Swiss-Prot record:
Pfam families xref list: Iso_dh
Residues that hold Mg(2+) according to the record: D211, D235, D239
Job of this protein: Catalyzes the oxidation of 3-carboxy-2-hydroxy-4-methylpentanoate (3-isopropylmalate) to 3-carboxy-4-methyl-2-oxopentanoate. The product decarboxylates to 4-methyl-2 oxopentanoate.
Pathway in which the depicted protein is active: Amino-acid biosynthesis; L-leucine biosynthesis; L-leucine from 3-methyl-2-oxobutanoate: step 3/4
Gene: leuB
Annotated protein name in UniProt: 3-isopropylmalate dehydrogenase
Native source organism of the sequence: Mycobacterium tuberculosis (strain ATCC 25618 / H37Rv)
Superkingdom assignment: Bacteria
Length: 336
């Protein structure tokens, strides 16, 4: 296995070190290459993501990312120049966000309900393609547009992936959109789910408007198994899903090229948290969860399950104990 590591900014290097510690414990001998990308490189060279680095990243099986972002860099420079560019260059058309409430983790929802679903979010289309513009900027007559781009090809490949995941899970898929208002894009998504669903007669299909889905995520999260949705709605509901499962500090994600032509990238959802960087108190659990996603994607299902069980055991027993970053990694690695 060839792994590219982008530790990034803030607490990124700290949590990534613990994730790699767990990876080495469960799958020894991984060939690792670290890339210095983020604020430090930007300040030193003016570069964000050189073409040569993109070419090198393509030669790896997967990418492990820590966190990107620093207040010393103008907002959007690293996000667009690094994260979004990687997404489009490597065709990460699926953003995978598991949502599970682990034993021992408190949910803001009363009764700590059973929560275990996954959101399959389209990652390269929708309103995030940069298709828009503005005229008469700064005047009372300013007009600004953002065009949501949805292609039959792009929608179908994400929907097909979601059905495959539903078949391997509890065989239930929910399309989340807003078809009553976004009739053109919504119609494409709805028709595609109906068409692809014909090949999956064992998977039950449901539809919810995005506003209703946010309500049910709070009042009845157990109804969801696999959610498939577009880029914008997915961006919003995945953070809500993380919140009801204990917060983004326990949320992992995968940015996936389902064709496997390019390496997929796995990362904790949390940010770089520069205010606590270097103090050794950042929680690396989400980064370690990202390792489980990475291993599963690469077909190392037994190793992925071992990491997940070790994380579950750690969360079930740590309670309110405050642990150093390295202590968390060592505990989880020892439980493998």
């Amino acid at each position: 296995m060839k792994l590219a590591i982008i530790a990034g900014d803030g607490i990124g290097p700290e949590v990534t070190a613990e994730a790699v510690k767990v990876l080495d414990a469960v799958v020894p001998g991984v060939q690792k290459t670290s890339y210095d990308l983020g604020a430090r490189r930007f300040h030193a060279t003016g570069e964000v993501l050189p073409d040569s680095v993109v070419a090198e990243l393509r030669n790896h099986d997967a990418i492990l990312l820590g966190a990107i972002g620093d207040p010393s860099v103008p907002s959007g420079v690293l996000e667009r120049g690094l994260l979004l560019r990687l997404r489009f260059e490597l065709d990460h058309h699926i953003n995978l966000r598991p949502a599970r409430l682990y034993p021992g983790v408190a949910s803001p929802l009363s009764g700590n309900p059973g929560i275990d679903f996954v959101v399959v979010r389209e990652g390269t289309e929708g309103p995030y393609t940069g298709n828009g513009g503005a005229i008469r900027v700064g005047t009372p007559n300013e007009v600004a547009t953002e065009v949501s781009v949805n292609t039959a090809f792009g929608v179908r490949r994400v929907v097909a992936d979601a059905f495959e995941r539903a078949r391997r899970r509890r065989k239930h898929l929910t399309l989340v959109h807003k078809t009553n208002v976004l009739t053109f894009a919504g119609g494409l998504w709805l028709r595609t789910v109906d068409e692809v669903g014909e090949c999956y007669p064992d998977v039950e299909v449901a539809y919810q408007h995005v506003d209703a889905a946010t309500i049910h995520m709070i009042t009845d999260p157990g109804r969801f198994d696999v959610i498939v949705t577009d880029n914008l709605f997915g961006d919003i509901i995945t953070d809500l899903a993380a919140a009801v499962c204990g917060g983004i500090g326990l949320a992992a994600s995968g940015n996936i090229d389902a064709t496997r032509a390019n390496p997929s990238m796995f990362e904790p959802v949390h940010g770089s948290a520069p205010d606590i960087a270097g103090q050794g108190i950042a929680d690396p659990t989400a980064a370690i969860m990202s390792v489980a996603l990475l291993l599963s994607h690469l077909g190392e299902h037994d190793a992925a399950a071992r990491v997940d069980r070790a994380v579950e055991a750690h969360l079930a027993t740590r309670g309110s104990e405050r642990l150093a970053t390295s202590d968390v990694g060592e505990r989880i690695a020892a439980a493998l």
